[in-house]
Amino acid sequence: MIIKTEADIKTTIPADDSIKGVQKQVLIGTEDGSDQIIMRRFIVEGGGHTPAHSHDFEHVVKVESGNGVVIDNEGHEHPVSAGNSLFIPPNEKHQFKNPHSQPFHFVCIILNPENSG
C-alpha cells in the first residue's frame, strides 16, 4: 500500500504552447507501483487552459475546487464546479478552461497509456 501526503507530490508545469497557466501533479503513478492507472491533479490558474485534445482511453475527472469550463467535441462549453464528476469517453475531444480569477483544481484518473492496449 502507498499513502502519500501533499509534501510527497511534485508539481510540474507542462511545456507546450497549447497550454497556459496549468500545473500538473502525479498523485499516484508508475513510480508508486501502479501499472494500470494514474491519478493526477491539475491546477488551472485564472485565464489558463489545458490543450484541446483526445486520446484512445476513457477517463474520469473530479473537480476539487474552483470553477471552470469543459469544452466538448462540438465546441460547447459546460460549466463545472467543485463536487462535479465527469466521464470522458475514448476519442472525445475535450479541453478545460478557467475563465475566472481563482484557481480551478481537478483530479483526473486515466489508464496508463503505456499499458492500456
Predicted regions and their residues:
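A short, N-terminal "cap"/entry segment at the start of jelly-roll beta-barrel domains
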Residues: 1-36
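Short acidic-glycine-tyrosine-enriched beta hairpin
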Residues: 74-90
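Conserved short histidine dyad/triad with adjacent acidic residue
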Residues: 40-55, 90
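Short, conserved beta-strand element in jelly-roll/cupin
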Residues: 43-45, 55-70
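Short beta-strand His + acidic residue motifs that chelate non-heme Fe in jelly-roll/DSBH
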Residues: 50-52, 70-71, 88, 94-100
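Ligand-binding loop in jelly-roll beta-barrel domains
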Residues: 82, 90-115
